[in-house]
Structures are given as structure tokens and as C-alpha cells.
């Protein structure tokens, strides 16, 4: 890396290592500011009449993140400044005073506050679409990991798998105003009665959950999809693991070309055994993984058996329970899942928090997976210094940001770093990328981040911890965040929350081919025993990884 990188951040052509993943991020562009960089501090350019323009924030930014590595799943990689006004990104480019510098895109006024982004990486806040919010503390774990949008399906230690009655949803929403994340709730979709589904949608559910524990049958899947088409929300599907009422072929037939989000498509989290993975590769079936199987590791098979038994009310002393639990745990489909992610066939990652997944690990498991499959690439040893991993990095970034936003109809608000989007931004030090964020901005305001000893003379004195910032306190969370609802509910009245509400949009027309850096169509084959998986006839395999990136060096 150039000598310029230490004080001012990298320039075009520099390569940045992402933690211990082995992934190489190459800077493809930098704003034209060499020798005239905007800096703040003693004897720096951020002074009135030099780098600061004497103007009100009607002409300048409320907040600027300067000289940061901007990582957007659509626009790619560049070094620039991010301007924020009234909680939204107002521009990305060169920051400064146009009276004293050329080519300024973002005016830094004498009222503008500044976050020094030199050497940091900025990404959109993560979007976790599969959260069993059995404890309110799950939201702390989410934002601590860089997630700023959560779609949940419970509200406390109650068996639910999708919230049903208006009274329960109302209580949940009133409580969730306190959390500094965007929130949506999935209504109970496992019903053959459209009226019971309509009740949860009118109570401001943002989608529907069909689950085998409450019935994933021909009737429930079809009814949920018909209601989703009526209201324009997404259906999250956990298929029939016992194959009692439907096989995987039957489920595909019932879906009938309609858009649907297939949760934990590998199957360990639930679904048709042993071949639910055959749902991947269809243009209308939008697929995701939950994080415990990512990447496929040495102890994954043994770990999952205990989780399945506990989460689904099974008895380890009952042979039939152990038998059906073991049928869900297949090394071959776990290995193939990792490969299908790299091919762009599986489109999203999520946590399945407290329902067999970990709320705070989706970012790091997504990029640990990227590092593992990159290392397994047979051509990697032949790479030259000019090679980089930008395309792979951006593909995996899309899995946790823009693609879930598209699938759940909120991409008009979040999922990207681009003008007009809500300024939900995670800032990372490169050595901790995807493991622990340095600072999380919610609606353009610091809500969570690294903080030091509060009695120290400087703010970075050890011990350093990830904790709430001012944007997570008082009335700020509801001011900086939104509720994900649906148009039909909002037309009937406001939600019982102080925060603003947005309606899902475009959920029913989404296809895999619309997703960013994904959408490969083809045929996944799974043998009758679940021990061989193919993609368009080619066998998919991967050895279980013994050492997972972004783990021991970063957490223990």
C-alpha cells in the first residue's frame, strides 16, 4: 500500500486485506483530492475559510464521513466522502469548501459535524430477515454486529413462528420502539383461512411466515401466497421436513411460479429431507441460508443435532425424535450450500437468531464463507499481484444488504450506500471487517460503536467495548428508525409506534434474476440419501474447514 494510505486512506490501485479472510479488496477509484485532502484536527484544513464554508446546513451537510472506503454492492469500491442531510445520504464524492478547492461535491459548512473515515470501510447496515426475537437482547446483538434492519417473528419467550393476533402484534410494536434498528414483523402464514392471515397484515405485519411446525401444506402455502399477492408482502417459507403432505416437487408445484423466500434452503434448519436444496436455482424462489452452517465446518454436523432437538421440542430419549432430527443433518448438503453461495445460486444470508442461529454472527459468517470458498478455489495459487477479490466481496456483501432489501420490498429505503437512501451505515476497521464494527450509524447518527473507559481523559482508552451511543438512547431510536408495514394496513390507520412506518413495495414481482450479483438459474440435484449434490449435473463438494476466518483472532 502507498505511503499516502496511512494518513489519508488508500488511493486508486491500493489493496486492502479484509481481516484474516485472505480476501483482497482493490481500490478502483478515489476522488481527485491528492495534496488537498479535507482533514479535521489541529493545524488541519477543516477550519472556517479553508476547508469549511461559512454557510448554513441548507447549503451544506449535517454530517460528513470523510475519505472512507465506500463499499456498495451495486456501485462497487471507491474512496470518497459520504454526505448526510436529515438522516439520508445526500451525496458521495469529494468533501470540502468549493470556495477554496476544486471539484467539491459535498459542502462542509461551519455547522457540519465530521466523522474521520480515513482508512475505514463503510458498508450499508446489514439486513437480517430471519430473527426469532425470543429475547429483547437479540436486538443488541444484531446492531453490535453491524445489522440495522431486523425482520422478526416473535416477541418474547412464546412459541409463535409468526405473530398472529392484533393484540399480540400491538404489544410487540409498542415495545420495539425502543430499539435502534428498523423493525418488521412476520405474521402467521400457516393458515388455510385467509381471514386469520388478514388480521396480522392489518396489524402491520410486513410479511408472512409459513412453517412446518404450524403447517406447511398445500393449503397453507397457497393461502399465504394469495394473501401476499393481494397486499404486496413477501412470504417466508419453511417447508415440510417430514414430507407428510408435500414433497419438494409438490411444494414447487404449489408455489406455481409465484415469488417466495425459501428460508435455510440447505435444510438443516428445517424443510424437505433430504432434498429441500432443490428449491435453489428457480427464478421465482428466492433463497437464503441461516448462519450456523456457514461456512461448512468440522463440527457442524454434531453441533446441529443438539440445536434441532432443543429448538423443536424433541426428546433425546425418544428414538423416533432422534431419527427425524438426524435426517435433517447432512454433510453433503452443507458442503454444497457453500459452493452454491459462491456461484450466486443462493442469494441471501440471515441468522435464524434463537431458532438455531446466532444474531450477532451473520456478517462474519458471510465473509468467513467468502474467504473459505476463495481459498478452496483451485486457481487461487496461480494469482498474480494484480488480482483481487472485488467481485466476490461485492457478491457476498449483496447477500446481507441489498438482496434482502429487494426481496422484502424495502430497497427504496435501505440496502445501499447511494444518494436518497437512509444513512444506515456500518464503519469497519479493515482488520476487523465483518467481525466487529467500529461505529454503526442509524439514520445518519451514531447509535452503536466502540467506546472506551468513560473516566479516561480520551475516548479511546482501554478497555474498549461495543456499546450504545446517543442514537440508541431516549427518543432517538424511534426518530432514526422505521417500522416495515404494508400499504393496506397503513391506509387503515397508523401503527402503534412513535417511529414512522413504510410500506413494502414490489415484493410479488421479484425474481432471482433481479437480484444484485446473483440469479444463476439451473438445476440442483440431491440423491435419495442426501449424500450427493449436483449443480447442472456437476457434483458439488467441499472439505469441512478446520479453521474459520474472523473467529479466534477476533473474538477469543
Language-model-derived ranges and their functions:
Residues 1-103, 143-149, 225, 330-347, ...:
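Active-site microenvironment of metallo-dependent hydrolases
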Residues 1-54, 110-122, 139-233, 257, ...:
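Divalent-metal coordination cores built from histidine and acidic residues
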Residues 64, 113, 125-127, 235, ...:
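Residue-level marker for buried hydrophobic side chains located in beta-strands
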Residues 98-110, 118:
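His/Asp/Glu-rich metal-coordinating catalytic cores
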Residues 120-141, 534-535:
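Di-metal (Zn2+ and/or Mg2+/Mn2+) metal-binding site signature of metallo-dependent hydrolases
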Residues 123-130, 151-154, 186, 262-266, ...:
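Active-site neighborhood of phospho(di)ester-bond hydrolases with catalytic His/Asp-centered motifs
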Residues 133, 155-159, 189, 241, ...:
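Acidic, glycine-rich active-site loops and adjacent beta-strand->loop/helix elements
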Residues 208-397, 406-408, 414, 447-450:
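Active-site core of metal-dependent hydrolases
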Amino acid at each position: 500500500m502507498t505511503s499516502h494510505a496511512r494518513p489519508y486512506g488508500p488511493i486508486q490501485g491500493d489493496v486492502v486485506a479484509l481481516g484474516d479472510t485472505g480476501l483482497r479488496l482493490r481500490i478502483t477509484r478515489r476522488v481527485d483530492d491528492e495534496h488537498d485532502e479535507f482533514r479535521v484536527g489541529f493545524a488541519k484544513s477543516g477550519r472556517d475559510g479553508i476547508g469549511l464554508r461559512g454557510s448554513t446546513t441548507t447549503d451544506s451537510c449535517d454530517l460528513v464521513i470523510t475519505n472512507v472506503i465506500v463499499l456498495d454492492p451495486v456501485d462497487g469500491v471507491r474512496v470518497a466522502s459520504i454526505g448526510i442531510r436529515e438522516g439520508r445520504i445526500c451525496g458521495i464524492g469529494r468533501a470540502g469548501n468549493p470556495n477554496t478547492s476544486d471539484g467539491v461535491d459535498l459542502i462542509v459548512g461551519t455547522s457540519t459535524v465530521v466523522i474521520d473515515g480515513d482508512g475505514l470501510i463503510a458498508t450499508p447496515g446489514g439486513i437480517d430477515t430471519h430473527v426469532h426475537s425470543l429475547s429483547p437482547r437479540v436486538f443488541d446483538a444484531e446492531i453490535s454486529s453491524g445489522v440495522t434492519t431486523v425482520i422478526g417473528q416473535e416477541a418474547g419467550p412464546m412459541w409463535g413462528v409468526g405473530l398472529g393476533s392484533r393484540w399480540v402484534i400491538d404489544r410487540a410494536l409498542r415495545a420495539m420502539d425502543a430499539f435502534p434498528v428498523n423493525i418488521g414483523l412476520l405474521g402467521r402464514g400457516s393458515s388455510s383461512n385467509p381471514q386469520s392471515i388478514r388480521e396480522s397484515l392489518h396489524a402491520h405485519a410486513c410479511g408472512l411466515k409459513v412453517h412446518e411446525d404450524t403447517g406447511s401444506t398445500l393449503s397453507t402455502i397457497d393461502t399465504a401466497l394469495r394473501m401476499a399477492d393481494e397486499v404486496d408482502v413477501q412470504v417466508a417459507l419453511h417447508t415440510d421436513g417430514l414430507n407428510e403432505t408435500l414433497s419438494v416437487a409438490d411444494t414447487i408445484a404449489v408455489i406455481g411460479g409465484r415469488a417466495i423466500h425459501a428460508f435455510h434452503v440447505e435444510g438443516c434448519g428445517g424443510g424437505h429431507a433430504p432434498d429441500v436444496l432443490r428449491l435453489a436455482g428457480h427464478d421465482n424462489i428466492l433463497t437464503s441460508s441461516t448462519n450456523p452452517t456457514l461456512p461448512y465446518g468440522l463440527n457442524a454436523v454434531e453441533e446441529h443435532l443438539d440445536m434441532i432437538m432443543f429448538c423443536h421440542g424433541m426428546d433425546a430419549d425418544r428414538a423416533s425424535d432422534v431419527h427425524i432430527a438426524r435426517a435433517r443433518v447432512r454433510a453433503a448438503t452443507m458442503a454444497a450450500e457453500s459452493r452454491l453461495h459462491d456461484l450466486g445460486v443462493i442469494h441471501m444470508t440471515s441468522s435464524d437468531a434463537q431458532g438455531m442461529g446466532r444474531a450477532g454472527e451473520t456478517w462474519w459468517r458471510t465473509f468467513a464463507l467468502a474467504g473459505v470458498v476463495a481459498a478452496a478455489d483451485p486457481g487461487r495459487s496461480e494469482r498474480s499481484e494484480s488480482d483481487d477479490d472485488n467481485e466476490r466481496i461485492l457478491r457476498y456483501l449483496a447477500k446481507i444488504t441489498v438482496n434482502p432489501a429487494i426481496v422484502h420490498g424495502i430497497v427504496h429505503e435501505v440496502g445501499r450506500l447511494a444518494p436518497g437512501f437512509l444513512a444506515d451505515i456500518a464503519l469497519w476497521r479493515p482488520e476487523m471487517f465483518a467481525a466487529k464494527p467500529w461505529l454503526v450509524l442509524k439514520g445518519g447518527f451514531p447509535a452503536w460503536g466502540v467506546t472506551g473507559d468513560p473516566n479516561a481523559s480520551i475516548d479511546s482508552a482501554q478497555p474498549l467495548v461495543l456499546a450504545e451511543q446517543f442514537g440508541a438512547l431516549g427518543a432517538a431510536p424511534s426518530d432514526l428508525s422505521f417500522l416495515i408495514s404494508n400499504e393496506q394496513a397503513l391506509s387503515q390507520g397508523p401503527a402503534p409506534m412513535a417511529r414512522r412506518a413504510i410500506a413494502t413495495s414490489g415484493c410479488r414481482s421479484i425474481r432471482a434474476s433481479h437480484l444484485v450479483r446473483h440469479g444463476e438459474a439451473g438445476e440442483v440435484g440431491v440423491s435419495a440419501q442426501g449424500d450427493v449434490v449436483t449443480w447442472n449435473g456437476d457434483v458439488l463438494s467441499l472439505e469441512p474447514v478446520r479453521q474459520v476466518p474472523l473467529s479466534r483472532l477476533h473474538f477469543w
